[in-house]
């Protein structure tokens, strides 16, 4: 039969690229699970009353090339003015070697958070380098492996200050009046839910205020002034007040480390170490503190430990501080951080080294001195005598200056009374400085750059002598070796080889949705039209961003069944926090601010109780029945007991137990009956899209993990995006922003992220995914994700029983394998199986969540039947190995499972094991071998001997 032109054009071609199993493989799997079709399987699994009758109207699919062309046309509407706005965001030069070999490399961007350190040593080393950069520049003892942005780091610093404060009755937090406005905005939002009073005043007046537990200072103020706070910090410390300092990472190359001046906590943005502005993000924040406060720090911390053979190995340290273990008692709700961006900043420091960084910082400062000298020579007044890269210039004809700047396609900071702000950066040239002279002075100023340079080179007083750094930085060999592109390329490749990412094998982590991050989706993030915009540029310069964000929001509204979407939260945990704040403020608007009880099922992800605690709520746990479902009797009892104090329930759907609960609508109705709101966690949205939706189910608010369902890569632990969808009654209560008015949002609420649209520059990834898949492809993706999970469950059921199933013995898009009976019989644990999978070339499934002693498997729709069968065969082979232990062929203390993973060096070492080398490293005929570089980590040693900076030089010799 002759095909039509429409068929030949094949606008849905990308659907077949994204979905792993082809039609024949899908039919084989359907036969294996006993279903006639994808629709029939979906109909059996998803409760009838929540199935959508018609698919969401998000349009037809587009080819990769058509979608790229369409998005390019949208991006071209953005105007790329030269930005001197500053305020914590500057233009950068990302070294091409890092752009090509990391940012554009799936070996880096498709990896997961390094919970399995044996397959993560490369990015762990890069993160350890990031921590070393932080330690050297801040002068403190302990650093984290990144936070979400500078403003949220400030909020975390405030919370940490209260945790460690000895002034237990003090409840006021002082913020210096010249911190960045977006930082103050986020601090105020967090303080409100914690019940702290925020005082904003001149830093020198801090001692006039009583009952202050913590202080936030900014070393280089928002309008550019360098502050020497040494004496003030000393006085504050004598009064037992915890001092936090916000610092500029490039300025720290030249300026005294705040830690040396007595600061307890130092944080800031690492954006200017090679990460484009991207209309606000994603960017990594750095965070450091004194050693005595290490167990109160937020976020991931990378530590040096030992493996089973005594070799140096890296791991995430002190995880007992974090939400996945401590839940509502965690230091923070942080789950995703900004690993990919931290690693870009880390490698930027490695590539330039201390000499290169000083050259960059000195060049920026020299050009700033030249600009200052020329302006002063012509009679303009600078508001501050001491500065690094930012001038606050008083101008009589401000309107005229701004008009000339606009004509020259220049953005100055314009929100300062009777003055303009000018921040220079590493992209600034002498030609740029001449252009600034023209804008500020007119064309006939007669100034000469070389003449001014000679003047300021010998007589620069813009940095106080006491504020000049007098210690060496980045002395470790890693920062002093890889300065040629050849060396740098090989170093990055050596790190990449140590890790297991999606470019090598499926990553079957339950609750994580490690699906394809298609190349076509990734391409737009490096387009300068998206990468080079300042988040606070005039809105008419960001029309492309606004159009793209509006389209994406409209699609998400239709896919979720909500009425509005807020794009600001820059992680899933931030989305939870923002959604809960919307609920809190909604209740307050109805004079029901007393509603503060949040019901959370026992199976919930750890971020849920941690976020509820951050939002000022009390957590009450609801039991689950023997089938893993929410116990309706217990729910009713807890809701009735809470009564007028019930704020909400946080529920995940499908549940974290991997099933579609039949009573989800009844759960919503019970909570609504008692005046509560329903927060439906979007972690498992990949099993809803096109089939059902949170709004249709009856929820009021959800966050969406764009880094799960909508294809933003995990980046080894970030970036993520967690926009929230809300019903109309909650829309007035989503986050706002103090600097930028968010179009279409009537909210007057505070911000939860530094930038108005969070990590805006990665939103094109999700735009591309939805545009290329269309309604048809999105539904099919959900259906194939369900098929793949049921195929794995059915084939592994006899070897590893599936703990929870729904109607007809089916699972949703993931399944929980119960290892507990095997452990009782044989002594082999879920940990042993997870580590043995490494020898077979696989990342482990999620261990012991949501049930201890289990493995949760989520294959996603992107994995083909060939890869699923390879994983299944590996699991069945491992089961056969367990049977060998059970039969006594191998002793429990010496077998391929408890000794896993095996590394190359073992092949040439003495071999005294009762199994062969071949069984150890080439089990079941593994062909494409992945070699871990370390054996099993010693977690206890790592936490008892905490060491979180680069390993000693001897390790490099």
Curated annotation (Swiss-Prot):
<comment type="subunit">
    <text>The glycine cleavage system is composed of four proteins: P, T, L and H.</text>
</comment>
<dbReference type="InterPro" id="IPR049316">
    <property type="entry name" value="GDC-P_C"/>
</dbReference>
<dbReference type="GO" id="GO:0005829">
    <property type="term" value="C:cytosol"/>
</dbReference>
<dbReference type="InterPro" id="IPR015424">
    <property type="entry name" value="PyrdxlP-dep_Trfase"/>
</dbReference>
<dbReference type="InterPro" id="IPR049315">
    <property type="entry name" value="GDC-P_N"/>
</dbReference>
<dbReference type="GO" id="GO:0006730">
    <property type="term" value="P:one-carbon metabolic process"/>
</dbReference>
<dbReference type="GO" id="GO:0016594">
    <property type="term" value="F:glycine binding"/>
</dbReference>
<protein>
    <recommendedName>
        <fullName>Glycine dehydrogenase (decarboxylating)</fullName>
        <ecNumber>1.4.4.2</ecNumber>
    </recommendedName>
</protein>
<dbReference type="GO" id="GO:0042802">
    <property type="term" value="F:identical protein binding"/>
</dbReference>
<dbReference type="GO" id="GO:0019464">
    <property type="term" value="P:glycine decarboxylation via glycine cleavage system"/>
</dbReference>
<keyword id="KW-0560">Oxidoreductase</keyword>
<dbReference type="InterPro" id="IPR015421">
    <property type="entry name" value="PyrdxlP-dep_Trfase_major"/>
</dbReference>
<feature type="modified residue" description="N6-(pyridoxal phosphate)lysine">
    <location>
        <position position="708"/>
    </location>
</feature>
<dbReference type="Pfam" id="PF02347">
    <property type="entry name" value="GDC-P"/>
</dbReference>
<dbReference type="GO" id="GO:0005960">
    <property type="term" value="C:glycine cleavage complex"/>
</dbReference>
<dbReference type="InterPro" id="IPR020581">
    <property type="entry name" value="GDC_P"/>
</dbReference>
<dbReference type="InterPro" id="IPR003437">
    <property type="entry name" value="GcvP"/>
</dbReference>
<dbReference type="GO" id="GO:0030170">
    <property type="term" value="F:pyridoxal phosphate binding"/>
</dbReference>
<keyword id="KW-0663">Pyridoxal phosphate</keyword>
<comment type="similarity">
    <text>Belongs to the GcvP family.</text>
</comment>
<dbReference type="Pfam" id="PF21478">
    <property type="entry name" value="GcvP2_C"/>
</dbReference>
<comment type="function">
    <text>The glycine cleavage system catalyzes the degradation of glycine. The P protein binds the alpha-amino group of glycine through its pyridoxal phosphate cofactor; CO(2) is released and the remaining methylamine moiety is then transferred to the lipoamide cofactor of the H protein.</text>
</comment>
<dbReference type="GO" id="GO:0004375">
    <property type="term" value="F:glycine dehydrogenase (decarboxylating) activity"/>
</dbReference>
<dbReference type="InterPro" id="IPR015422">
    <property type="entry name" value="PyrdxlP-dep_Trfase_small"/>
</dbReference>
């Amino acid at each position: 039969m002759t095909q039509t032109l429409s068929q030949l054009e094949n606008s849905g071609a990308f659907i077949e690229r994204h979905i792993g199993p082809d039609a024949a493989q899908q039919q084989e799997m359907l036969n294996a699970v006993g279903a006639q079709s994808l629709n029939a399987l979906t109909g059996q699994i998803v409760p009838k009353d929540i199935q959508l009758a018609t698919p969401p109207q998000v349009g037809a699919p587009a080819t990769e090339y058509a979608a790229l062309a369409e998005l390019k046309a949208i991006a071209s509407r953005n105007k790329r003015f030269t930005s001197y706005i500053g305020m914590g965001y500057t233009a950068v030069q990302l070294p091409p070697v890092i752009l090509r070999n990391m940012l554009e490399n799936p070996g880096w961007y498709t990896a997961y958070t390094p919970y399995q350190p044996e397959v993560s040593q490369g990015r762990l080393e890069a993160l350890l380098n990031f921590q070393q950069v932080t330690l050297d520049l801040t002068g403190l003892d302990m650093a984290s492996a990144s936070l979400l942005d500078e403003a949220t780091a400030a909020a975390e610093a405030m919370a940490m200050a209260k945790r460690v404060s000895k002034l237990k009755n003090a409840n006021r937090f002082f913020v210096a009046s010249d911190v960045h406005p977006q930082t103050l905005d986020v601090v105020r939002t967090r303080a409100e839910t914690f019940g702290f009073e925020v005082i904003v005043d001149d830093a020198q007046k801090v001692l006039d205020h009583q009952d202050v537990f913590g202080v936030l200072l900014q070393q280089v103020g928002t309008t550019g002034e360098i502050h020497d706070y040494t004496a003030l910090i000393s006085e504050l410390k004598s009064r037992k007040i915890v001092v936090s300092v916000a610092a500029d990472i490039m300025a720290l190359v030249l300026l005294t480390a705040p830690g040396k001046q007595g600061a307890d906590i130092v944080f800031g943005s690492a954006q200017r170490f090679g990460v484009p502005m991207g209309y606000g993000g994603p960017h990594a924040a750095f965070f450091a503190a004194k050693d005595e406060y290490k167990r109160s720090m937020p976020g991931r911390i990378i530590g040096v430990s030992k493996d089973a053979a005594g070799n140096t190995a890296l791991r995430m340290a002190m995880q007992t501080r974090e939400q996945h273990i401590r839940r509502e008692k965690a230091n923070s709700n942080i789950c995703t951080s900004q690993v990919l961006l931290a690693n870009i900043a880390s490698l930027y420091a490695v590539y330039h080294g201390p000499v290169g960084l000083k050259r960059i910082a000195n060049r920026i400062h020299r050009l700033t001195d030249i600009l200052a000298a020329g302006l002063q020579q012509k009679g303009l007044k600078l508001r501050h005598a001491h500065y690094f890269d930012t001038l606050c210039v008083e101008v009589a004809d401000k309107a005229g200056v701004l008009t000339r700047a606009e004509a020259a396609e220049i953005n100055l900071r314009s929100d300062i009374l009777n003055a303009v702000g000018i921040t220079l950066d590493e992209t600034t040239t002498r030609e740029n400085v001449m252009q600034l002279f023209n804008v500020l002075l007119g064309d006939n100023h007669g100034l000469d750059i070389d003449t001014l340079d000679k003047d300021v080179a010998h007589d620069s007083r813009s940095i106080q002598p006491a504020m000049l750094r007098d210690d060496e930085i980045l002395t470790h060999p890693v920062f002093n070796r890889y300065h040629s592109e050849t060396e740098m390329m090989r170093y990055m490749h050596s790190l990449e080889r140590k890790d297991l990412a999606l470019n090598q094998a499926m990553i079957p982590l339950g609750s994580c949705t490690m699906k394809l991050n298609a190349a076509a989706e990734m391409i737009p993030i490096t387009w300068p039209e998206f990468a080079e915009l300042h988040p606070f540029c005039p809105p008419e310069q960001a029309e492309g961003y606004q159009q793209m964000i509006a389209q994406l929001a409209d699609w998400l509204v239709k896919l979720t069944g909500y009425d509005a979407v807020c794009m600001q939260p820059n992680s899933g945990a931030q989305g939870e926090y923002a959604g809960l704040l919307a609920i809190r403020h909604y209740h307050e608007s109805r004079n029901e601010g007393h509603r503060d009880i949040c019901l959370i099922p026992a199976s919930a992800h750890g971020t849920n109780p941690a976020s509820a605690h951050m939002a000022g709520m009390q957590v009450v746990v609801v039991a689950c029945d023997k089938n893993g479902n929410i116990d309706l009797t217990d729910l009713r009892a807890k809701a009735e007991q809470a009564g007028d104090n019930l704020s909400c329930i946080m529920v995940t759907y499908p549940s974290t137990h991997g099933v579609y609960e039949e009573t989800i609508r009844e759960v919503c109705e019970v909570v609504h009956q008692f005046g509560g709101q329903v927060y439906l966690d979007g972690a498992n949205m990949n099993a809803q899209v096109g089939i059902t939706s949170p709004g249709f189910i009856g929820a009021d608010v959800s966050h969406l993990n764009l880094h799960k369902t909508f294809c933003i890569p995990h980046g080894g632990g970030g970036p993520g995006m967690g926009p929230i969808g809300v019903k109309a009654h909650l829309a007035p209560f989503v986050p706002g922003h103090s600097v930028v008015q968010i179009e279409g949002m009537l909210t007057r609420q505070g911000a939860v992220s530094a930038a108005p649209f969070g990590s805006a520059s990665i939103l094109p990834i999700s735009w591309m995914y939805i545009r290329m898949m269309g309604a048809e492809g999105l539904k099919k993706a959900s259906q194939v994700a369900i098929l793949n999970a049921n195929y794995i469950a059915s084939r592994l059921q006899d070897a590893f029983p599936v703990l929870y199933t729904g109607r007809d013995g089916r699972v949703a898009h993931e399944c929980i394998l119960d290892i507990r009976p095997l452990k009782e019989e044989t002594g082999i644990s879920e940990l042993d199986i997870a580590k043995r999978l490494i020898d077979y070339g696989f990342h482990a499934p999620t261990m012991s969540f949501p049930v201890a002693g289990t493995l949760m498997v989520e294959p996603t729709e992107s994995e083909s039947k060939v890869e699923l069968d390879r994983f299944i065969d590996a699991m069945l082979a491992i089961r056969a190995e367990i049977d060998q232990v059970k039969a006594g062929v191998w002793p429990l203390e010496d077998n391929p499972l408890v000794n896993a993973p095996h590394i190359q060096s073992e092949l040439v070492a003495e071999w005294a094991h009762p199994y062969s080398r071949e069984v150890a490293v080439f089990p079941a005929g593994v062909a494409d071998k992945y070699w871990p570089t370390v054996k099993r980590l010693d977690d206890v040693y790592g936490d008892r001997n905490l060491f979180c900076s680069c390993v000693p030089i001897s390790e490099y010799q």
